[in-house]
Amino acid sequence: MSKSTAEIRQAFLDFFHSKGHQVVASSSLVPDNDPTLLFTNAGMNQFKDVFLGLDKRAYSRATTSQRCVRAGGKHNDLENVGYTARHHTFFEMLGNFSFGDYFKHDAISYAWELLTGENWFNLPKERLWVTVYETDDEAFDIWQQQIGVPAERIIRIGDNKGGAFASDNFWQMGDTGPCGPCTEIFYDHGDHIWGGPPGSPEEDGDRYIEIWNLVFMQFNRQSDGTMLPLPKPSVDTGMGLERIAAVLQHVNSNYEIDLFSKLIAAVAKVTGATDLDNKSLRVIADHIRSCAFLVSDGVTPSNEGRGYVLRRIIRRAVRHGNMLGAKDTFFYKLVAPLIEVMGPAADELKRQQSLVEQVLKTEEDQFARTLERGLTLLDEELANLQGDTLDGETAFRLYDTYGFPVDLTADVCRERGLKVDEAGFEQAMEAQRRRARESSGFGADYNSMIRVDGASQFSGYDHEQQQSTVTALFRDGQPVNEIHAGEEAVVVLDETPFYGESGGQVGDKGVLKAANADFEVSDTQKYGQAIGHQGKLSHGSLKVNDRVDAKIDTVRRNRIRLNHSATHLLHAALRQTLGEHVAQKGSLVNDKYLRFDFSHFEAMKPEQIRTVEDLVNQQIRRNLPVQTEVMALDDAKGKGAMALFGEKYDDNVRVLTMGDFSTELCGGTHASRTGDIGLFRILSESGTAAGIRRIEAVTGDGAIATLHQQNDLLQDVAHLVKGDSNNLTDKVRAVLDRTRALEKELQQLKDQQAAQESASLSSKAKMVNGVQLLVSQLDNVEAKMLRTMVDDLKNQLGSAIIVLATTADDKVSLIAGVTKDLTDRVKAGELIGNVAQQVGGKGGGRPDMAQAGGTDVSALPAALDSVEAWVASKL
């Protein structure tokens, strides 16, 4: 009996654990501290800094089963998913790693033992082929002489990608840095499947499938291309779990393994599909994996970055569900079956199941409203298409109006043997981006160009004033030795109490005083390891190496400290009230208020907002001590400290605790005790994106000020309704009831007036070619009453053409009515359009009723006079 996918995953980890490897949990799909990566796409991502020598671990051998996503960016498999046997947006990468421990011999021996050992995968040795880099004689000899693979099944692969060391069998992290040859292991499915061995003209067939890649990092590539040997060579291997499962379960497609078979059955059940070979089932089964795990790891659908890739995948899945005939939202219903088939690998997903389901359902609901209209428009465009390529402008219009990602449009075209002009689409997208930039009002940001060598020591945790030395000056983004009165600049100090903006906390303001100069600091920013003070020299001159007295605005800093501490209390209170799925997604802390963005799938109820506010104020009244401790990052996480999503942390981190209520990593400035905050009040709760909510709040004096404002407002209202705080609600309700009664009475009077006006007007109708025509300008009649009057006149006249007009505030309001027996000859929309054009306006409507407006009141009499001749020409 073949192993299940879950058993294969566990066997891999158990094997390497028996060889002295530390089993390390999968890292998030959102790369930790690596802005160069859109998503985690390989097992080595979480060890990148270890391989670069920037980080050290307590172990020198590791093994993982890493969740990976390849969709968007350089590694983008999206368009092939569902149409090939092995492409996925989400997959698991099994890997073993050596950090300066073992090298080629042990790496190859371990791989062979696991693949062919009787107690492990027990693959037939004669089915395995290997490739090595062309000049890697060491690896070739290990395979041939020590492992016993015949030379005819060991293939040397050279530089087959158009440059030196540009090869399928030479791995490099970038243009410089760690790199080295690799050896790949292939499985031969047999001659009943088309394809040739690697390096042959038929290598793209499905007979020989790569199952494992062993990378040997043995060189450090220099900027001039020189390859220097690394002092401690390392090993990084990767084997796709789904691929090895297909081999061990004796199937030729990843979509036939047990995991996908169960998921595909679940997709068929929720969509009502009966043909289990339909490619759309594969697409959806793949996409629920990437989407569910991305949401679980903190990504939410949006129109940029990672969120946009997630949105594209969800919408592609929904469109394929639509093709299968799904009548209702279905995608979110696949989270539960996914958790079941993934087993222990889905523990975190299971904890966040309700949040993930809600985010997916909300996005599906949102897209379903426009999917049908967008597909109809696309069908019309393709029906009229000349040639085999849809133009980029149309693809962009589908994206801009209906939220159709271009790859979804390409998907539809592909099914019909057509293509999309993706270059034209990108041109239209870039034109939109350019318009957005031009309308944003932002010019060049010279500060963003500043590059500072060296570092500044931050002393602001303990000091509000500091004697410092100027180490650098920048004017218009360029380094200078001296600045003069009236000039704006950035001043860098060797040591400073000024906090540089980070972690949501704004930078400090204050003053730098020199012997004969004052520099007013309006903001403080970080430039690498340096802290830059932005501002203006009010008088004198300031030079590099001058001594200054750096003093922050302490009143402002104190308000910021209170607001920052309140965000920590708020975060903890939200998690207690709404659930553990709540995670910080962004914040702004200044001296006036705090803004806190967090993950949650629906608007908070008023009682939940009150509960959170009360909980924070309880902690303020407890006057908890606010304490900080510096420790190793892993120790801090072990202590339960929350590491914030997307935040970059050093090896040693600052852990901030507030009694027993909150523990977070934070480098900001804070109150000494929670009681210093005084009072906390929530001003608003709103949504910023799917699955993201925002709270704005105030503390201390700001919170007290809002109480005064609300009290003053209540007093004003009480005075207006002649009441007091005890009976204010009853008084306001009485005023509203009376207002509604008067409005109803007024409407009745207006209806009576309209009926009377209509009765008097009907006698003014004249015959034009045997048809009654009534044209009239009315005074002191509201525009919205014209429609009622036209309906009344139609009933009174039986068969007629009517045009009514009124004016107010230098604007013309027009309406035309045509009884249904005459609409084959006179259309109300055409009639009103002719009149509106003469008074500087436009309008339209149905053949029997149309409205319009205009701006030229003086032209109205002549325009109405022209109606009779126009109508006569139509009769």
Curated annotation (Swiss-Prot):
Cofactor (UniProt): Zn(2+)
Source taxon at top rank: Bacteria
Main localisation: cytoplasm
Enzyme Commission number, as recorded: 6.1.1.7
Disulfide bonds: none
GO BP terms in the entry: alanyl-tRNA aminoacylation; negative regulation of DNA-templated transcription
One Pfam family from the record: tRNA-synt_2c
Subcellular localization: Cytoplasm
Residues annotated for Zn(2+) binding in this entry: 564, 568, 666, 670
GO cellular component: cytosol
GO molecular function: alanine-tRNA ligase activity; aminoacyl-tRNA deacylase activity; ATP binding; tRNA binding; zinc ion binding
InterPro entries: aa-tRNA-synth_II/BPL/LPL, Ala-tRNA-lgiase_IIc, Ala-tRNA-ligase_IIc_anticod-bd, Ala-tRNA-synth_IIc_core, Ala-tRNA-synth_IIc_N, Ala-tRNA_ligase, Ala_tRNA_ligase_euk/bac, DHHA1_dom
Keyword annotations from UniProtKB, A to Z: Aminoacyl-tRNA synthetase, ATP-binding, Cytoplasm, Ligase, Metal-binding, Nucleotide-binding, Protein biosynthesis, RNA-binding, tRNA-binding, Zinc
Cofactor binding note from Swiss-Prot or TrEMBL: Binds 1 zinc ion per subunit.
Enzyme class, spelled out: ligase
Catalytic activity: tRNA(Ala) + L-alanine + ATP = L-alanyl-tRNA(Ala) + AMP + diphosphate
Assembly behavior: Homotetramer.
Task of the protein: Catalyzes the attachment of alanine to tRNA(Ala) in a two-step reaction: alanine is first activated by ATP to form Ala-AMP and then transferred to the acceptor end of tRNA(Ala). Also edits incorrectly charged Ser-tRNA(Ala) and Gly-tRNA(Ala) via its editing domain.
Family to which the UniProt record says this protein belongs: Belongs to the class-II aminoacyl-tRNA synthetase family.
Domain topic, free-text comment: Consists of three domains; the N-terminal catalytic domain, the editing domain and the C-terminal C-Ala domain. The editing domain removes incorrectly charged amino acids, while the C-Ala domain, along with tRNA(Ala), serves as a bridge to cooperatively bring together the editing and aminoacylation centers thus stimulating deacylation of misacylated tRNAs.
Name by which UniProt lists this protein: Alanine--tRNA ligase
Organism of derivation: Serratia proteamaculans (strain 568)
Taxonomic path: Bacteria, Pseudomonadati, Pseudomonadota, Gammaproteobacteria, Enterobacterales
